[in-house]
Regions:
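Structural recognition of the beta-strand scaffold that forms the well-ordered cores
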Residues: 1-5, 34-40, 79-83, 114-119, ...
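Aromatic-lined carbohydrate-binding/catalytic grooves of carbohydrate-active enzymes
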Residues: 17-126
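Aromatic-lined carbohydrate-recognition surfaces of secreted/lumenal glycan-active proteins
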Residues: 78-95, 141-159
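Carbohydrate-binding surface patches
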Residues: 238, 244-247, 252, 289-330
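Catalytic cores of secreted or luminal carbohydrate-active enzymes
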Residues: 238-285
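Solvent-exposed beta-hairpin/edge-strand motifs
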Residues: 325-343
Length: 371
């Protein structure tokens, strides 16, 4: 869980802005809630490498260097994240890591970087796609530093190929794994793919079923206050973070923390949502479809369950949740007792089935236990 300043600041990033954002994360209780990464993007270096092929820090923007910045963030309980590219250039035109994975990985480690967002950008047609990923994986491992490796792309076959090549699938608090991987798909809802004709919410809903047994990759980056993604409404934001939580999918908020509203902070720091997201067992959810909605159920520790219910229609509807599909036997005499994590409203105890009334495209996230 963390924040990215790439969209809000872009090339205007500098040391003061980063430390100000970090202080705001602490002030709003976001760090205490578990938002531990802060991505400063790709504009921290100069547009050209030095004579030895190394990336050069921009000392105008970061007069004390990234190593100082990393230490300053660590003192606040925050870890430093940066963006690099699979290809020749980064999104803002800075040097990419193609064919320089090992030298860049060493640089990142020396600068105290904790998280690498490896973006599929400016890849030469003959360079291939998967070999640079494997090289960066090996290069980061070779540094001996604990660096979180996140892949950011939109590629229809990437999950199958990553599984085939032996990459690890980890969920929940991926920072607990030395070589964890977050498959962060730049969904159409981020506005990256301008050719998409769907609305942001339609695109987001279309990817809710991107789920593979044993794989709980990142649903998306959430852009707050962005014209391409309307998360100003607390219920819209709650739906998006709930989808991430039920899939143990890391949440990266693409916004300046200072721009958050009080309601947005309440949603992002909700203890029930984070409890589901960071459950130590990190189980993939079961998906139960009906005519008008979808129910995701996930086994949690302490004999509890996460339940995410979505109305898939354009009208108000009552989405059924059948305990038989969930795995209960009617003769067991067990009952389901659950509450809405965002409102704390308790749902009536039920045995065979429940109907969850939702507005058009609405959702609710519950924590449930059997009694």
């Amino acid at each position: 869980m963390g924040f990215s300043l790439e969209k809000s600041l872009g090339e205007n990033i500098d040391q003061k802005a980063v430390l100000t954002a970090a202080d705001k994360m602490v002030e709003l209780g976001l760090v205490a809630a578990g938002y531990e990464y802060l991505n400063i993007g790709d504009a921290w270096c100069l547009p050209s490498r030095d004579d030895n092929g190394k990336l050069v820090e921009d000392t105008t923007k970061f007069p004390f260097g990234l190593k100082y910045l990393s230490a300053a963030l660590h003192a606040k309980g925050i870890k430093l994240a940066i963006t690099t590219s699979v290809g020749a250039l980064t999104p803002n035109g800075y040097p990419g890591s193609l064919d320089r994975e090992y030298i860049d990985a060493d640089t990142f480690a020396q600068l105290g970087v904790d998280y690498i967002s490896h973006v599929a950008c400016d890849i030469p047609a003959t360079a291939g796609f998967f070999t640079p990923l494997r090289r960066m994986n090996m290069a980061l491992r070779a540094t001996g530093r604990r660096i979180f490796y996140a892949l950011t792309f939109d590629h229809s076959k990437i999950m199958d190929r990553m599984y085939y090549t032996g990459y690890e699938w980890d969920g929940a608090d991926l920072s607990e794994y030395t070589n964890g991987y977050a498959i962060e798909k730049w969904l159409r809802s981020t506005g990256v793919n301008s050719f998409c004709t769907k609305s942001p919410d339609e695109a987001f809903d279309a990817h809710l079923d991107d789920n593979i047994i044993g794989y709980t990759g990142t649903q998306c980056w959430l852009s707050l206050g962005d014209v391409t993604v309307d998360c100003e409404c607390a219920c819209a934001l709650a739906k998006k973070v709930s989808a991430c939580a039920i899939k143990c999918s890391p949440i990266i908020i693409n916004a300046d923390p200072a721009a958050l509203t009080e309601k947005q902070v309440e949603v992002l720091t909700n203890k029930g949502m984070i409890r589901i997201l960071k459950d130590e067992e990190s189980r993939a959810p079961a998906v139960l479809k009906s005519d008008n909605g979808t129910v995701y159920t996930k086994l949690l520790t302490d004999r509890e369950y996460g339940v995410f219910v979505i109305n898939d229609t354009d009208n108000e509807a009552s989405v059924p949740f059948y305990t038989f599909d969930f795995g209960m036997v009617y003769s067991s005499e067990l009952k389901c007792d659950m509450y809405d994590v965002f409102t704390n409203e308790k749902h009536p105890v039920f045995t065979d089935a429940a109907r969850i009334k939702l507005p058009a495209k609405g959702s609710k996230l519950f924590i449930m236990k059997l009694v």
